[in-house]
Amino acid sequence: MLNLEVIIETGEQVIQKISFNLQHISSVLNTEVFDPFDYCYYRGGNFWEIESAEDCSGDDEFIE
């Protein structure tokens, strides 16, 4: 015969573990992730660091 108390207790433990994992995932997603394209641009097979806002003005001609 099924022991409903054990099944319910196990279900509650699983729910708590899932809740903990979701909270952890949420906190990781809320942290700022380094994006190299915020600080670099890619041209000619190389990454170049952007030193100022003038470096990314966008008026450069695209060269392959």
UniProtKB/Swiss-Prot annotation:
It comes from the Viruses. InterPro entries: IBV_3B (IPR005295). This is Non-structural protein 3b. It comes from Avian infectious bronchitis virus (strain Beaudette). The lineage of its organism: Viruses, Riboviria, Orthornavirae, Pisuviricota, Pisoniviricetes.
